[in-house]
From Swiss-Prot:
It holds the Pfam family MRG. This is Chromatin modification-related protein EAF3. Residues 184-356 form the MRG domain. Involved in deacetylation of histones, chromatin assembly and chromosome segregation. May act as a transcriptional oscillator, directing histone deacetylases to specific chromosomal domains. Component of the NuA4 histone acetyltransferase complex which is involved in transcriptional activation of selected genes principally by acetylation of nucleosomal histone H4 and H2A. The NuA4 complex is also involved in DNA repair. The gene is EAF3.
Length: 358
């Protein structure tokens, strides 16, 4: 059975094949798009509103597909490397890929050295614990039990894995960041407003308990948020020095985010999504794709990052002050609904099985 408009197909999303429906077909020779509602419409025709193929896919045949049972936010263009005809042979392949994924999940403890078994917290999960301590001591208040749970995902896992994960966390942290034990300046505290702590707790529960993902690309990416913050904040000071410091601070935030996203800021469930976004938006910086949730994850980890670097005390004080101002500004704008928190989307059981075994 060939791949036809409005017909069934199978598409790779990560390592698995999923049933999908072809909504649009792109003809690379004529640079046109065909759907149920229109035929051979030029890709440059602005009168017709539709999602166009990314630039890097326009040199070949591609299809706009909807994954059966998934929300339309997952609809996307796929090339010939990811799409397969809906036939018995490929259905068998789909089945075998699912079985292999299950085997990998069940034998997680036998994976190659250096991989993280299911149940072990990722670096962002470890970071939530440190971020919670930082925000608590900076604000002088105690968090609720749910906040404690969010800051330490291992505490919500089975009792058999909690102690091992805790011990392993300490060992991993010593190996990864030896400088943390040799601080030459006082411990750095950032004041995280209570409302933002609640956002981070909800974020942890949505991803780790409810198996949801932040909907990406964000409607208000970090680039937009920080540009708005600069516009609002720079107007309140006439000091050239302070404006220069603010600009440098925001450039540093963007740099930190783009460098640390894949290493520090993602839960395991998010890694397939991350790989897909990287492939679909290779021309963009992460700050142009991710939004407020991931920015908050970064800012709450900045104390640890600063402590492990060679930042002098004076610079650290300036950075802490700017972080406090940024977080307060974010809290106010969320409360005023100037920009909402990014929505979450559900994942399929197959996606979860593969993502959590990585």
């Amino acid at each position: 059975m060939a791949i036809v408009l409005d017909g069934k197909c199978l598409c790779y999303h990560g390592p698995l094949l999923y049933e999908a429906k072809v909504l649009r077909v792109y003809d690379e020779k004529n640079q046109t798009i065909t759907s149920k509602d229109y035929k051979d419409v030029s890709i440059d025709d602005e009168k017709v509103e539709f999602d166009r193929p990314p630039e890097h896919m326009r040199q070949g045949q591609c299809y706009f597909v909807h994954y059966q049972g998934w929300k339309s936010s997952w609809d996307e263009w796929v090339g010939l490397d990811r799409i397969r005809p809906y036939n018995d042979e490929n259905l068998e392949l789909k089945k075998s890929l699912v079985e292999k994924a299950r085997e990998l999940k069940n034998n997680g403890g036998k994976k190659k050295s250096g991989s993280r078994p299911v149940g072990r917290p990722s670096k962002v999960e470890k970071g939530k614990k440190a971020a919670s301590r930082t925000s608590n001591s900076g604000s002088g208040t105690n968090t609720s039990a749910s906040s404690t749970s969010a800051s330490n995902p291992a505490s919500s896992s089975s009792s058999g894995t909690t102690a091992a994960a805790s011990s392993s966390d300490k060992s991993d942290r010593k190996k990864a960041t030896p400088v943390l034990n040799k601080r030459s300046h006082p411990k750095i505290h950032i004041k995280v407003p209570i409302s933002l702590r609640s956002v981070l707790v909800d974020d942890w529960e949505n991803v780790t308990k409810d198996r949801k993902l932040v909907q990406l690309p964000s409607e208000r990416p970090i680039e937009h948020i920080l540009s708005q913050f600069y516009a609002d904040t720079s107007n309140s000071t006439s000091s050239v020095v302070e404006q220069a410091q603010l600009s440098e601070f925001l450039q540093g935030i963007k740099l930190y985010f783009n460098l640390s996203l894949g290493k520090l800021l993602l839960y395991r469930l998010e890694r397939i999504q991350y790989a897909e976004l990287l492939k679909a938006h290779s021309e963009k910086q992460y700050t142009e794709i991710y939004g407020i949730i991931h920015l908050l994850r970064l800012v709450t980890l900045l104390p640890e990052m600063m402590e492990s670097s060679n930042v002098d005390d004076q610079t650290a004080k300036i950075l802490v002050k700017q972080c406090d101002i940024l977080l307060e500004w974010i809290a106010i704008n969320i409360a005023r609904k100037n920009f909402p928190v990014d929505p979450y989307i559900n994942t399929s059981s197959q996606y979860e099985g593969v993502a959590l075994s990585m």
